Swiss-Prot record:
Belongs to the diphthine synthase family. Pathway: Protein modification; peptidyl-diphthamide biosynthesis. It comes from the Archaea. S-adenosyl-L-methionine binds at residues 10, 87, 90, 115-116, 166, 209, 234. Its EC number is 2.1.1.98. HAMAP family: Diphthine_synth. This is Diphthine synthase. GO terms for molecular function: diphthine synthase activity. GO terms for biological process: methylation; protein histidyl modification to diphthamide.
Amino acid sequence: MPLYFIGLGLYDEKDITLKGLEIAKRCDKVYAEFYTSLMAGTTLEKIEEVIGKKIIVLNREDVEMNFEKIVLPEAKEKEVAFLTAGDPMVATTHAELRIRAKRMGVESYVIHAPSIYSAVAITGLHIYKFGKSATVAYPEGNWFPTSYYDVVKENLERGLHTLLFLDIKAEKGKYMTANEAMELLLKVEEMRGENVFTPNTLVVVLGRAGSLNPTIRAGYVKDMIKEDFGKQPHVLIVPGKLHVVEAEYLVEIAGAPKEILEQFAPRKM
């Protein structure tokens, strides 16, 4: 019997596609995980109401260590759905799960849904100009990750934008804000001193992507770090070289300083 990886979309229970909803409704068993992303506009109960089935929520250990014991044996006998926020295959963990299913002889299918990788276009930045993305992680004990700083540096050297995901500690109900991410990047800058991320760096914050009223703000770190971007989830974007239309969009829609337009010659309207 098949295993269906079904995306729930970005914000609430209405983001699932008709195809995903139809398949989830007919499955014999429905599992889900919410530790890789946050759907701020809904609850488990609302999703269950839409699907019409009880959902078994798995934690990180269940998914990463015990998927073969919990989910895959069921999928050999029944139609099973595995629900995830966003698009199922954006999280590398889910790609690995599909490999495990194949090795255990379980046929699997992917039902796509809205993803942050497409929704980020609402910032006005051109999708084809994004480079490698990275996650800004909370330091823990003696561990202070800095790889995201290197990703920003590499992308800026190529004139590319950087999409930064922000750390999630779902088991603690802790979701990093864009402000915290900027603070961490500034700390790394203090340690490295490579002039990659400074108070004068232009950044874009997107909050609650997929909702009807997302936060879209652009400005310099020294100003943005003090702003309230509302409820999480947030993503932080460090723009690379801007096209004139991108710059105009950031000014008109995201409230960026008009001075970012000074590098461009006046446009003929």
